[in-house]
Amino acid sequence: MATITGSSMPTRTACFNYQGRSAESKLNLPQIHFNNNQAFPVLGLRSLNKLHVRTARATSGSSDTSEKSLGKIVCGMSLVFVGAEVGPWSKTGGLGDVLGGLPPVLAGNGHRVMTVSPRYDQYKDAWDTNVLVEVKVGDKIETVRFFHCYKRGVDRVFVDHPLFLERVWGKTGSKLYGPKTGIDYRDNQLRFSLLCQAALEAPRVLNLNSSKYFSGPYGEDVIFVANDWHSALIPCYLKSMYKSRGLYKNAKVAFCIHNIAYQGRNAFSDFSLLNLPDEFRSSFDFIDGYNKPCEGKKINWMKAGILESDQVFTVSPHYAKELISGEDRGVELDNIIRSTGIIGIVNGMDNREWSPQTDRYIDVHYNETTVTEAKPLLKGTLQAEIGLPVDSSIPLIGFIGRLEEQKGSDILVEAIAKFADENVQIVVLGTGKKIMEKQIEVLEEKYPGKAIGITKFNSPLAHKIIAGADFIVIPSRFEPCGLVQLHAMPYGTVPIVSSTGGLVDTVKEGYTGFHAGPFDVECEDVDPDDVDKLAATVKRALKTYGTQAMKQIILNCMAQNFSWKKPAKLWEKALLNLEVTGNVAGIDGDEIAPLAKENVATP
């Protein structure tokens, strides 16, 4: 167990229920707007001004969530989310989005919520707590320091250590796990062992008083929510270092699988690095048919996290079904997950950042009453910016995503050849594996005036594609939940998707999008059948362009609600079933300080 070496010791803890009574927690203390500088290639300012007026009238009766009362605060659950990413401070995919978006909504419902993640950069809004703890990592004793900020009702805790900061400083966006895509740091096991141990100390040693409703340490009656293999040691250390000594007696662990493809498989001999008793070895034991990272017997962090936790979650109901359907989609952990059971809850999204009514990156703000006027404007601006012929009558397809096998960009590249002779344009935006970046970079040469590939990702352009495109294509071989389709639909941008994971749960064929069917999950080669299915589905979607059916699909898309409200309630219900002492249901509250400024990492 870690030891405290800092001077800031916890002093008290309190929470308030809706009647204002305090309750003690048991503690075990250790020693449409437009930018003037942007021009429109189609339509004029007169059309734009009319659109602005219509949108303003349509939205004038809506209420601002910031003006709503926060409701009654209850002392619900004490929740500690642990992950290698937390948006917007650190994010490479859906994991960071979940840890950024779900906790504030749970906090708004009356729960006390903390996230613990590495301090990869000099985050300007996080301050040193002056609390240090010592943990054993491998054969060394390491000292870690905690940084903290309180945002949108959540205690954001960052673990400070050279294993994180010196490795990634100034390059957070793509260097969290390795020097380049597909290559891991050799000491990742030590890095994330340190994270897990520090995360277990944080609720006990940090005296946090940012909230007017809660103060002091979180104490020990908490639920840890571990996310992906990087935090899979949480339940193991909890049992071996704490419960065995009478600490964290009532604490429970929920383990969430965001992507089964990344399991933390390592050499069997590396088990000794984890400083766990031999009784845990069987939970890590794993044999597969691959010679990476080594031949023969291995340890598997995710397997252990699944087996040792109290409840297993994943990020959509259909993905949960896929994980137990067989070893191809369960990636050889299907039998394990089938034995433990699993709960699938669709992710929400940040509808503050992704809203056509407030998006800071687009020139025209709009809603369902003005979408048919706004999108041609935005399409024309996008076409001009990326170098495609400006013509609002041509349907425009967008792709946004990592260029790797999972996301199916290689399938898309081959499918373009089969529909490029249609009246269509396509823009592909993403970064990733070099071989796939090269495939994208030659699209303009192969299909002049029809296709553009951009391998320098930037957030403003992603927003402009989401708003300006008519369709968004998501040809994933597998997709646990997916966020691009959630972002696109509120903008009236219609998804064309493969039928896998969360895409099945969120996109309804003929109602809010078009399904191509499931694709082969093997990533070694492109399956010609998948190429044909994708091309046929794109052609089918293009036939609806400009029709009344298409207009209805657009309105259906914009009517969808993908906020975190409903997922948060489902999470709450499932976590309450863990029956941690003192935990009670929350309220149907509003997020605390929903308009807080965006956080920016400052190297």
Curated annotation (Swiss-Prot):
Expressed in pods and leaves. No expression in flowers or stipules. Its EC number is 2.4.1.242. ADP-alpha-D-glucose binds at residue 91. Signal peptide: none annotated. Disulfide bonds: none annotated. GO terms for cellular component: amyloplast; chloroplast. Pathway: Glycan biosynthesis; starch biosynthesis. It is found in: Plastid, Chloroplast; Plastid, Amyloplast. Residues 1-75 form a transit peptide. Gene3D superfamilies: Glycogen Phosphorylase B. Pfam families: Glyco_transf_5, Glycos_transf_1. Its main location: plastid. It catalyses: an NDP-alpha-D-glucose + [(1->4)-alpha-D-glucosyl](n) = [(1->4)-alpha-D-glucosyl](n+1) + a ribonucleoside 5'-diphosphate + H(+). Keywords: Amyloplast, Chloroplast, Glycosyltransferase, Plastid, Starch biosynthesis, Transferase, Transit peptide. The keyword Glycosyltransferase applies. GO terms for biological process: starch biosynthetic process. NCBIfam families: glgA (TIGR02095). Belongs to the glycosyltransferase 1 family. Bacterial/plant glycogen synthase subfamily. May be responsible for the synthesis of amylose. This is Granule-bound starch synthase 1, chloroplastic/amyloplastic.
